């Protein structure tokens, strides 16, 4: 199948739109389809998807912009692939939105969207490039321009995404991995390797093992499962190294158990080796574990960057990773993707994105990073009044205005300064307790770091009117996780795995951005005004 761009961007003389009555045409142009057809569909860039298709002359592909547009519409209304395809054949609004009113036959069949997604999954698995991400973020940037949103103010937040899996106990996890591999061997006519384990193939065996027995038999069940697992490892050897079920069994045993003198037992806390990336459920090997805000999460995490203006807000960047990915690393990745800003812009985040390294990386891109909260304990405000040289390698003056007698620098790793003053200068200074000055026999000494100096400056900034206005802007991004969960069912995606979850999440971001644009076009938005956005 070869790649061909979709040139059908205008109505033809035989277009089905002309067969509608004037009343029907007016109703169509007042609907969501008008905004989608004029502002979203033409902005879908098909060119990056060229790599998914053959360069040889062959049957042309289904238009990429129709596929991407249909996937976004699917998330807007929360419907299935089949419903999208049926509606495209029967509903003029869908045809108008996707510019297919002039087609003799609608271009989507029952497998079109599935095959398109599969091509994107395979390409990302091989090359590590998410083609949909570039498309959705490009649409977000275009929507921001249509809504007249200045890109100089942005805010950021992260959210947990639940994986589509059951929470398993350790013994259930071991049983499931053994059962899946036994079932694989049975289906592939390898019954000689599973003698005595045929009960794993019984659909009711799971319930018999865990629900129809008393607690006293749990130890015996665990021993039996571990012995069966060892038996499978001995009989299969290296012949099944490429089989997913075998790989998951080996992974589970290496993470959950330990072998002592040829005897396998469960790993304990004293043995160590527990980590958040351990297998949670063989149905989704990519899902990880994280405890956040007193709650346990299994699955993934998403980071959202929202551009804010007087006419509303639009998500202009997002990232989808395993949930043990830190907020600080999300910010670093975002800054790495961001080009240098000709005009200084502001990024407003919470305390999880704070840190001098992040502030320095943002400054390199001409971005002012504002944290509405700071992690760790507060420090004395007096540290903000120490004056450093231009390159930040020497203390020039203390808060009382004294020049130091000497200044020792520990280097770029700890960035601490050991500063000496005349003994009387600190001994008689009213700030000596706040600076934690040490009075020696001949001199006085103070230890101050660049990090503490920057933190004190941030704490001082938090008391200003400008910060309070920025804080109000930051609060708005907290609505995104709620919207994505309630309206777009981000915690109930019908797929498993990091790559598939990332693709579906991108479609949901596209749907949410369209809703924001449609609200703006219809004049239905109510946007709180802020002096920072003026």
Predicted regions and their residues:
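Basic, low-complexity segments
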Residues: 1-56
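Anion-binding and metal-coordination hotspots
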Residues: 80-83, 88, 102, 106, ...
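Helix-boundary capping/turn motifs
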Residues: 39-44, 59-64, 87-89
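Short, basic interhelical loop/turn and adjoining N-cap
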Residues: 92-109
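Alpha-helical support elements that line or immediately flank enzyme active sites
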Residues: 68-78
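Double-stranded DNA-binding cores of transcription factors and transposases
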Residues: 3, 64-65
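Short helix-loop boundary/capping segments at the starts of domains
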Residues: 46, 50, 54, 76-79, ...
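A short glycine/serine-rich beta->alpha loop
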Residues: 52-60, 495-497
């Amino acid at each position: 199948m070869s790649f061909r761009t979709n040139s059908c961007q205008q109505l033809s003389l035989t277009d089905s739109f002309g067969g509608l009555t004037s009343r029907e045409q007016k109703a169509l142009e007042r609907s969501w389809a008008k905004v989608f057809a004029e502002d979203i569909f033409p902005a879908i860039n098909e060119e990056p998807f060229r790599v998914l298709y053959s360069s040889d002359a062959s049957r042309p592909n289904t238009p990429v912009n129709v596929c991407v547009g249909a996937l976004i519409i699917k998330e807007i209304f929360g419907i299935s692939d089949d419903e999208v395809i049926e509606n495209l054949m029967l509903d003029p609004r869908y045809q108008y939105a996707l510019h297919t009113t002039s087609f003799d036959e609608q271009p989507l069949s029952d497998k079109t969207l599935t095959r398109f997604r599969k091509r994107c999954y395979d390409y990302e698995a091989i090359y590590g490039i998410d083609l949909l991400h570039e498309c959705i973020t490009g649409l977000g940037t275009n929507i921001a321009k249509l809504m007249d949103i200045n890109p100089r103010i942005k805010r950021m937040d992260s959210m947990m995404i639940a994986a589509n899996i059951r929470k398993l106990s350790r013994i259930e996890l071991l049983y499931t991995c053994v059962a899946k591999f036994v079932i694989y061997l049975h289906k592939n006519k390898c019954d000689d390797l599973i003698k005595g384990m045929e009960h794993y193939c019984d659909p009711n065996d799971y319930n018999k093992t865990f629900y129809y027995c008393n607690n006293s038999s749990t130890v015996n069940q665990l021993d039996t499962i571990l012995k069966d697992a060892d038996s499978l490892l001995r009989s299969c050897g290296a012949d099944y190294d490429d089989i997913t079920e075998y790989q998951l069994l080996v992974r589970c045993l290496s993470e959950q158990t330990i072998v002592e003198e040829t005897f396998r037992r469960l790993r304990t806390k004293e043995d160590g080796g527990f980590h958040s990336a351990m297998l949670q459920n063989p149905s989704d090997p990519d899902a990880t574990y994280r405890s956040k805000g007193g709650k346990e999460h299994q699955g993934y995490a998403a980071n959202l960057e929202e551009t804010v203006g007087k006419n509303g807000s639009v998500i202009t960047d997002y990232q989808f990773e395993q949930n043990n990915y830190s907020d600080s690393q999300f910010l670093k990745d975002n800054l790495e993707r961001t080009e240098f800003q000709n005009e200084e812009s502001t990024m407003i985040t919470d305390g999880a994105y704070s840190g001098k390294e992040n502030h320095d990386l943002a400054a390199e891109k001409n971005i002012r990073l504002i944290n509405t909260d700071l992690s760790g304990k507060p420090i004395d405000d007096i540290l903000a009044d120490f004056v450093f040289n231009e390159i930040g390698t020497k203390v020039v003056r203390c808060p009382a205005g004294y020049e130091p007698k000497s200044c020792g620098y520990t280097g770029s790793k700890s960035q601490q300064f050991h500063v000496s003053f005349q003994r009387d200068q600190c001994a008689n200074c009213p700030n000596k307790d706040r600076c934690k000055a040490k009075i020696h026999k001949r001199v006085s000494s103070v230890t101050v770091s660049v990090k503490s100096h920057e933190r004190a400056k941030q704490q001082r900034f938090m008391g200003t009117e400008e910060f309070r206005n920025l804080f109000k802007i930051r609060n708005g991004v907290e609505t995104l996780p709620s919207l994505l969960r309630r309206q777009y069912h981000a915690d109930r995606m019908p797929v498993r795995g990091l790559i598939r979850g990332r693709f579906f999440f991108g479609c949901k971001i596209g749907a949410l951005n369209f809703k924001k644009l449609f609200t703006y076009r219809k004049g239905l938005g109510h946007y709180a005004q802020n002096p920072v956005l003026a």
